[in-house]
């Protein structure tokens, strides 16, 4: 009897899930404002925060978000439909200055009405100019040639910048990802070479222990190896190398390596890093010299700085390993170098 009940429960669960998925497919999804998808998300110093953008005033510490900089932004969405050849024939967009009205299907700022059109990209807001530094809410429903009228989409929130123009490109804040070594090698007693596997712009965070007999270590950061050690003198090339002495406190402590100023990329014409991120340097390898205690991957962290990047948005795989490696190199290069623009090398394009 219990087995039968379990099976019935499982069948009901599957049926409910299928209905939910079917219902979800009938709503427009993938809503974007000025081509930014995650407009309701906030970040704190590079890491995602749990506070939604419409509760920004409740934050004690500064938060970052993808500010919409246009007084008349454009809305985009993905048209729902399970049938091949599904085409949108009409849409209706509403915009409200509060979540409750939007959730109830009321656009107290703008209601486009039913517009006969197949357009689902860059539908421009046509209400009164939005105000700076405020949160807004919108949603859309569509009519298609195969499914008829859809349900309302989920409510999408966005927040405007402190200064607005008729049109200005919106963008995400820079974010951080914690990365751990793929290998730690003891070069000689007291000296370890840490390899993060790939080069990246970032900062180094170390958790080290000292019994008080050793008061300092030396940290080397670099992009290239020579003879199994980090290349100390890359000459006039754009390969980077940095050396940082680190004084140790007695006990176990976490240290953030302060990146030194480089005259080549911190001049008056340089693209400066935002204060909530701090300075970064490109490196793949780290050498820790003069440290006798055990060193684990968890105690050496690279905080990689990059523009938000969806690893699942594209993929490629074929029978040719060389082509696969070229694809991965190109994909990683976009992620690693696009936080302030597309770079030819480590630092040249931000000078």
Language model regions located:
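Hydrophobic h-region of N-terminal signal peptides that target proteins for export
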Residues: 13-22
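Active-site core of glycosidic bond-cleaving carbohydrate-active enzymes
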Residues: 351
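Extracellular/oxidizing-compartment recognition motifs
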Residues: 24-348
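Bacterial N-terminal signal peptides that target proteins for export
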Residues: 1-12
């Amino acid at each position: 009897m219990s087995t039968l009940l379990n099976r019935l429960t499982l069948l009901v669960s599957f049926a409910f899930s299928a209905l939910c998925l079917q219902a979800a497919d009938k709503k427009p999804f993938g809503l974007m404002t000025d081509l930014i998808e995650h407009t309701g998300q906030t970040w704190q110093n590079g890491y995602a925060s749990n506070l939604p953008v419409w509760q920004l005033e409740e934050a004690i510490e500064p938060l970052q978000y993808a500010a919409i900089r246009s007084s008349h932004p454009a809305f985009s969405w993905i048209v729902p439909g399970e049938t091949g050849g599904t085409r949108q024939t009409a849409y209706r967009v509403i915009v409200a200055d509060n979540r409750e009205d939007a959730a109830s299907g009321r656009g107290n700022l703008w209601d486009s009405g039913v517009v006969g059109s197949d357009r689902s990209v860059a539908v421009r807001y046509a209400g009164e100019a939005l105000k700076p530094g405020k949160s807004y809410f919108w949603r859309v429903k569509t009519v298609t040639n195969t499914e008829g009228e859809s349900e309302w989409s989920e409510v999408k929130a966005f927040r405007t910048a402190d200064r607005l123009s008729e049109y200005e490109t919106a963008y995400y804040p820079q974010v951080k990802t914690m990365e751990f070594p793929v290998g730690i090698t003891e070069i000689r007693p007291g000296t370890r070479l840490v390899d993060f596997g790939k080069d990246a712009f970032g900062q180094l965070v170390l958790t080290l222990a000292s019994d008080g007999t050793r008061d300092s270590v030396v940290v080397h950061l670099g992009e290239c190896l020579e003879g199994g050690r980090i290349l100390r003198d890359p000459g006039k090339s754009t390969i980077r190398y940095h050396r940082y002495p680190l004084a140790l406190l007695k006990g176990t402590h976490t240290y953030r390596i302060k990146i030194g100023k480089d005259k080549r990329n911190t001049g008056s014409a340089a693209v400066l890093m935002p204060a909530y991120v701090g300075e970064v340097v490109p490196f793949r390898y780290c050498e820790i010299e003069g440290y006798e205690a055990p060193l684990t991957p968890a105690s050496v962290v690279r905080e990689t700085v990059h523009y938000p990047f969806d690893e699942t948005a594209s993929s490629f795989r074929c029978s040719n390993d060389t082509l696969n490696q070229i694809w991965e190199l190109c994909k990683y290069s976009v992620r690693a170098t696009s936080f302030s623009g597309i770079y030819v090398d480590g630092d040249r394009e931000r000078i």
